Design a protein with these regions (language model features):
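Transmembrane helix-loop-helix hairpins at membrane boundaries of multipass inner-membrane proteins
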Residues: 1-2, 15-111, 180-203, 207, ...
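Cytosolic juxtamembrane amphipathic/interface segments immediately preceding
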Residues: 66-70, 354-357, 439-446, 494-496, ...
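Alpha-helical transmembrane segments
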Residues: 83-84, 130-136, 167-170, 204-216, ...
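Hydrophobic transmembrane alpha-helices and their helix-loop junctions in integral membrane proteins
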Residues: 91-132, 141-449, 587, 600-603, ...
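Flexible extramembrane loops and terminal tails that flank transmembrane helices
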Residues: 602-611, 623, 677-832, 837-841, ...
């Protein structure tokens, strides 16, 4: 299987999972499990090509002129992470099948899980630095959705937002660092960057680049001082925690450090920043974990500590330490995933995760207890388990480090202290829960979980045992393949033997185990007695509080800046904007020779001059009437827009004219819907004061100056000869390469299709934002009543005996005739939209114009028939139109990649149909179909959000409570 297919498979599975019915629990889990299983098998089959330092590489051309191609690259390190992502992902899917409640929206869960798996695979397999950052940000996005999966819970929403803000900010720093790194190396290709270590380290921008990259890595892997988000992410379902916070998301940061280790390591800056952050995180996480009373929070802080251990190893500037870091990435993923699953089983079967309430579970859950105790022993570094081996390598590296004397003395002590803490919190997880008398006040009667729910824990704990007892046979080959790309050359000598003799690392292990037991016994009495409620000495240090204070300070600064520089009046904002424009233009032209060009002028037609006089009159009249008569102002704005439309026709630009006309109609409808809910204007007090008159004169002068200045600049530019035009390029290539004769449409859906896809994505985001803002909007009381023209007349009040109404109610059938006419217009407009869409590649039209026509036809039904009638007869599903449109656009682009062409390359097929004859069907037709769908969905979503105000209750007036 090609790497590109391997990368695309989870995303395809995610889309399919999202489309399955809500109650298809078994189908969802089976689909997700098959996708993960196929991926893990395919990744495993690729190992023979990578075992001796080989690299598998696929490159798909995208923007070769700027060095941006889709590069999928797998070496030993990427293979190891891909195995963890897919292997543990498959186990998590099986576990989640039994963990998730029948009331949970399972399609959404498995869709997000597969999408996150695809994002992690994309990041791991990226062979281009910008591409890596893109997938890096995707992991932040999908982790946000997974952490906040139970969005009805406030802690889940807070934890998801915190994780997104912290990791998203780090991602922006990483993006800046990637740009600098690519600038220094001369390429964003990972192979080029990995070979440019000496150049990068000697460059003046090395320190800045290093700090930016490390900010991205530290925020993702919860390194001090960005560690606080991980415990709050425990509000996620336990399968999410077992996947994201053991083997995938939190490993992204240390993976980045390992990936760029040959390029950035080996300097004093690397040693002190990376090593210092890792050491602080190691000690802080381990110490804090001992005091936690929630199972998942204990595991979260222990994860922080182990991530700090890996970071510290990578920061020691030692090849052997880098090998140990890679080894611990593998070991930590296995025992921590099993511990999270065991914690989830305990929570699932007892109804609580509070260690203070859980006792004696070994009596009722002996198998689960045994598995959890073995995994916690691996976490503590007990011999004959995998955690012991990498911990011994860590101890050895701290003992034999060559640095400053105080570092050589203090680092082994700190490592031993962290080991003591690890044993203590591991005992809290195991002994406190499974021994002592059985708790009797649990929310549920505890018992063993379903057999298949426990199978993932069985397999992971078995891996801990096998690796711990037979490391060279079971994992040595994989470790060598994964570590070789990290060290960037020949591997250092090391041994994975269980016994290395009685040496300094062994003494440190004995001290850690013995000291951990003592600390646990001392701590247990005080925790049970309630004498300790928070970590000693550092209880005042609360990362969450610091985070919230930082956000509050930023919000305060923004509010004060808004009060100082901002205004809620549009007139003041426009005054500042236009004043700055005039001043900037004047400054740029000051002292320069400003003159008209020498191009010959076209004789002006009296008809054209009359047309623009009408347009100018409409614009001026709209400005005059906007304050007094809104409907008249709207009519005059439409008159100015119609003049612009006819101007395009005059200059033989039918596509622009058609688009302008459709946009004018949509804009008019938008204004009509919006003006309905504006409060009535308060009559102006007369006479007008001198201050008001002065302000209006100032605004008039600025408006005239701005308008005349823009006209003068435009005239000066248009009367000068144009530089070399790009028009011949498109005119000669549109038909042979784009398969159409309409240059404008082919330009949009072929030559510049990626820009168009970005634009419809922005349009979709804007529509969803407007909908979200208007969803909770309530019109003021004074706008709820119908206008006088629509109110009931006396004859209605007399004759309507079935539904008696008062004079303020809506008149019976006041829009009956227009409603009938507009309903008859709907099918005609839809046929017209289809006609415009189908002819767009060769004649005036296209998906954008067709979408606007269809949208206007539907929204007119709302205007004349009302919201309730339309939605009782039509099921619009506006958001699905947007989603389907974006999906069409993306699939069209990926289809070109599948055939070896650049993204969104158009292919034209010649078909011969009976009766119709020969036709040509360009693949851009499907892209244009996506544009049509997004335009329909976005336009209807925005306009119907306004239309829905008519069926909502009013809000109180701002002056309703005034005496």
């Amino acid at each position: 299987m090609a790497l590109s297919v391997l990368l695309a498979l989870p995303f395809i599975g995610s889309v399919i999972a999202a489309l399955l019915p809500t109650n298809a629990r078994n189908a969802e889990s089976t689909l997700a499990g098959l996708v993960a299983l196929i991926c893990v098998v395919q990744v495993a089959l690729l190992f023979p090509a990578l075992g001796n330092g080989g690299v598998i590489r696929e490159e798909i051309l995208w923007l070769p002129s700027v060095g941006l191609n889709l590069v999928i690259r797998m070496d030993g390190l990427a293979w190891m992470l891909a195995m963890l992502v897919t292997g543990i992902g498959a186990l998590v899917v099986l576990y989640a099948r039994y963990y998730m409640s029948p009331a949970d929206p399972v399609p959404r869960f498995f869709s997000f899980l597969l999408a996150f798996m695809g994002a992690m695979m994309g990041m791991v397999l990226s062979g281009n630095l910008i591409q890596l950052v893109f997938f890096w940000e995707l992991t932040s996005l999908f982790s946000f959705l997974l952490i906040g999966y139970w969005h009805h819970r406030a802690d889940a929403r807070r934890g998801a937002r915190m994780a997104l803000i912290v990791t998203g900010a780090g991602g922006l720093c990483l993006f800046a660092g990637a740009l600098l790194l690519g600038h220094i190396a001369g390429s964003y290709d990972l192979d080029v960057i990995l070979a440019s270590g000496a150049i990068v380290r000697a460059h003046p921008l090395y320190t800045v680049t290093l700090v930016l990259v490390l900010l991205g890595a530290f925020t993702k892997s919860a390194q001090f001082p960005f560690h606080f988000w991980l415990p709050h992410a425990m509000a996620a379902p336990t399968p999410v925690s077992a996947y994201l916070h053991s083997a995938t998301m939190v490993k992204a940061g240390v993976f980045l450090l390992a990936r760029l280790w040959p390029v950035l390591s080996g300097t004093e800056q690397w040693f002190w920043i990376v090593g210092g952050a890792g050491l602080c995180t190691l000690l802080l996480g381990a110490y804090t974990a001992m005091f936690q009373n929630d199972l998942k929070r204990l595991l979260a802080y222990s994860t922080i500590s182990h991530l700090g251990l890996i970071t510290l190893l990578l920061g020691l500037n030692s090849s052997l330490a880098a090998v140990a870091a890679v080894f611990h990435i593998m070991n930590h993923a296995t025992f921590k995933a099993s511990l999270f699953m065991a914690a989830g089983i305990i929570d699932h079967e007892t109804g609580t995760r509070d260690i203070r309430r859980l006792n004696g579970l070994f009596k009722v859950m002996p198998i689960t207890a045994t598995l959890a105790m073995v995994a916690s022993a691996a976490m503590a570094g007990v011999p004959l388990l995998n955690g012991f081996l990498s911990k011994e390598m860590f101890f050895a590296e701290t003992v034999y480090i060559s640095s400053l004397p105080w570092v050589e003395f203090g680092l082994p002590l700190a490592a031993t202290l962290a080991g003591i803490f690890a044993v203590a919190y591991s005992l809290r997880f195991s002994y406190d829960i499974f021994f002592d008398p059985l708790s009797t006040d649990l929310p549920r009667r505890p018992h063993e979980p379903p057999r298949w729910m426990r199978v993932p824990v069985d397999l992971l704990v078995l891996a801990c045992l096998v690796v711990g007892m037979f490391p060279e046979i079971s994992i040595g080959w994989a470790l060598r393949a994964a570590a070789l790309p990290v060290v960037g050359g020949q591997l250092p000598e090391y041994s994975l033997s269980v016994w290395h003799g009685f040496n300094a690392p062994m003494i440190m292990s004995v001290v850690a185990i013995g000291g951990g037991i003592v600390v646990y016994l001392w701590l247990r009495k005080r925790l049970e007695g309630g004498r300790i409620e928070r970590p000693l000495l550092i209880g005042f240090f609360d990362g969450k509080r610091m985070y919230e204070r930082t956000l509050a300070a930023a919000n305060l600064v923004a509010r004060r800046a808004l009060l100082l520089f901002g205004t809620h009046r549009l007139q003041s904002q426009l005054f500042v904007l236009m004043s700055l424009t005039v001043l900037g233009t004047t400054f740029a032209l000051w002292g320069r020779d400003f003159s008209w060009g020498e191009r010959p002028l076209i004789p002006i037609s009296p008809m054209f001059a009359t047309l623009w006089l009408v347009g100018m009159a409409g614009a001026i009249g709209a400005a005059w009437q906007a304050k007094y008569h809104r409907l008249a102002a709207l009519t005059m704005i439409a008159m100015a827009g119609l003049a612009t439309c006819l101007t395009f026709v005059w200059f033989s630009a039918p596509d622009l004219a058609l688009t302008q006309l459709a946009v004018e109609v949509v804009t008019t409808v938008l204004f009509l819907l919006g003006l309905r809910w504006l409060p009535k204007r308060i009559p102006l007090e007369l006479p007008i004061t001198a201050q008001t008159l002065l302000r209006r004169s100032r605004d008039l002068a600025l408006a005239v100056l701005s308008g005349c200045g823009m006209a003068a600049l435009a005239y000066a530019m248009l009367t000068r000869p144009f530089p070399q035009s790009i028009s011949p390029y498109f005119l000669t290539r549109t038909l042979p390469e784009g398969g159409g004769t309409n240059v404008v449409n082919v330009l949009l859906v072929d030559f510049r299709s990626f820009d168009t896809m970005a634009e419809i994505t922005v349009l979709a985001a804007v529509a969803l934002t407007v909908y979200a803002l208007l969803r909770r909007f309530r019109p003021p009381r004074e706008t709820v009543q119908s206008p006088p023209q629509q109110r009931a007349l006396p004859p209605d009040l007399i004759t309507d005996l079935i539904n008696p109404r008062i004079a303020r109610d809506t008149a019976l059938g006041f829009m009956l005739v227009p409603a009938v006419l507009v309903r008859l217009l709907l099918p005609i407009a839809i046929v017209l939209a289809i006609y415009l869409f189908m002819r767009g590649h060769n004649e005036s039209g296209g998906g954008f114009v067709a979408g606007l026509v269809a949208s206007v036809a539907v929204i007119l039904q709302y205007i004349v028939a009302g919201t309730q009638w339309v939605e009782a007869h039509m099921e619009l599903r506006r958001s699905r139109w947007i989603a389907i449109g974006l999906l069409f656009a993306v699939i069209t682009g990926l289809g070109a990649l599948a055939f070896g062409y650049p993204f969104l390359t158009t292919h034209t097929a010649q078909l011969h149909l009976p009766v119709i004859g020969e036709i040509h069907v360009p693949s851009a037709l499907f892209f244009d179909m996506g544009v049509f769908s997004v335009v329909v969905g976005a336009t209807l979503l925005i306009l119907t959000a306004l239309a829905h105000q008519s069926v909502r209750s009013h809000r109180e007036s701002a002056h309703s409570g005034a005496p």
